[in-house]
Amino acid sequence: MTTLSHDSTTMPRTQRDTRRMNQFVSIAAAVAGLLFGLDIGVIAGALPFITDHFVLSSRLQEWVVSSMMLGAAIGALFNGWLSFRLGRKYSLMVGAVLFVAGSVGSAFATSVEMLLVARIVLGVAVGIASYTAPLYLSEMASENVRGKMISMYQLMVTLGIVMAFLSDTAFSYSGNWRAMLGVLALPAVVLIILVIFLPNSPRWLAEKGRHVEAEEVLRMLRDTSEKARDELNEIRESLKLKQGGWALFKVNRNVRRAVFLGMLLQAMQQFTGMNIIMYYAPRIFKMAGFTTTEQQMVATLVVGLTFMFATFIAVFTVDKAGRKPALKIGFSVMAIGTLVLGYCLMQFDNGTASSGLSWLSVGMTMMCIAGYAMSAAPVVWILCSEIQPLKCRDFGITCSTTTNWVSNMIIGATFLTLLDAIGAAGTFWLYTALNVAFIGVTFWLIPETKNVTLEHIERRLMSGEKLRNIGN
């Protein structure tokens, strides 16, 4: 599909053709998000049984959770090079193959050390997918649907989480954690098949000097040949910078600003604290008075469904509401939710809680997750794919995605330690304070990029405009 050398004018395409191609690209690439979500969700239900099987301490439990994030940071760190050399399409293929290997290795682990290694391999795959899929979608989509297409990736992440929670709930009666982990290989095989039929990114093709192929792909994706030609001309204009990556980062202040903003955005996303709910939901609900594994898993499933439905709404609102309003509202909702959840858990610690506080705790986790799903979860990935200059996009997104996974690893590897050190209330109130701080950062620094082309954002950035104004 990407090695077409004949003149595309001999192959007229209808708007229906372009719509179908855009839908296929969106769905196929977003399956990478499904894999990501499956792994986030599955460990929450599997961890109690893994802990019993291997007799794990709290520290080892944290490492079973966070070893995946360590691998993801490694995968994201090297994926800039991989994506530049192989292209976005074949980077997704490599990630899918590694996902199969990591899933099978986790299911057949005979020691905690073997499980940790398999989880790291799985993490490398997730790191590749989390880097490549949003980048690929941002480069394939037109500016008016770019946010929607990238939000589809986040929707598939949440669908994966819900599917994992359903699987965990089903297997929780038998405690079969190996089946919980091994079943993840199946969607990875589906992704391998889908990637075969994906076209290469036109921006990557143009960067490699393959302009005829780039225009052919753009004609598949855009409503008219004129739009395809105009976009290719803009891409070629942005490629006139002679340097790229690290070399450009060292000498160009504006590039450094974009890279550091992407890193800050990803750190903000993780330090909202929402992923600790995904990783440790059964433990949180145990602290909130749900005594049986089945009760904890049902409450966890409710949170997962909330995440999925809120993300579904976000898919259709992110390109209408804008990036900044979504972030400001989302951080506010998460601040309130973690504040009240901390209060509820303090009452349970003091032994003064009523049964109603158990359900209020569930309600607050649902509120937090809904706020996250409609703001930081999709919007940060959208912004990070939008703000990087083309010649430095691989490097910039490598830096931001690596920051995401390092931050993710930190929150995953410290949650149980924080519970022991400052208690459940103190832990969630810490995240309340961070979310309040992020509201201020959004006002001060974050740009609005709704309905703006990537090339226009790049021109504003490189002209030295304030970061909050580069989307204007």
Curated annotation (Swiss-Prot):
Membrane topology: Multi-pass membrane protein
Bridged cysteine pairs (disulfide): none
Cytoplasmic side: 1-29, 85-91, 136-154, 200-257, 319-325, 383-404, 447-472
Keyword Cell inner membrane set for record: yes
Superkingdom of origin: Bacteria
InterPro entries listed in its UniProt record: MFS_dom, MFS_sugar_transport-like, MFS_trans_sf, Myo-inositol_Transporter, Sugar/inositol_transpt, Sugar_transporter_CS
Chemical reaction(s) catalysed: L-arabinose(in) + H(+)(in) = L-arabinose(out) + H(+)(out); D-fucose(in) + H(+)(in) = D-fucose(out) + H(+)(out)
All ranges on the Periplasmic side of the membrane: 51-63, 113-114, 176-178, 279-297, 347-361
Entry's transmembrane regions: 30-50, 64-84, 92-112, 115-135, 155-175, 179-199, 258-278, 298-318, 326-346, 362-382, 405-425, 426-446
Subcellular location: Cell inner membrane
GO CC aspect terms: plasma membrane
GO function terms (MF aspect): symporter activity
Keyword NAD: no
Alphabetically ordered keywords of this record: Cell inner membrane, Cell membrane, Membrane, Sugar transport, Symport, Transmembrane, Transmembrane helix, Transport
Family the UniProt entry places it in: Belongs to the major facilitator superfamily. Sugar transporter (TC 2.A.1.1) family.
NCBIfam families: SP
Biological role stated in the UniProt entry: Uptake of L-arabinose across the cytoplasmic membrane with the concomitant transport of protons into the cell (symport system). D-fucose, a nonmetabolizable analog of L-arabinose, is also a good substrate.
Protein's UniProt name: Arabinose-proton symporter
Organism, scientific name: Klebsiella oxytoca
Originating gene: araE
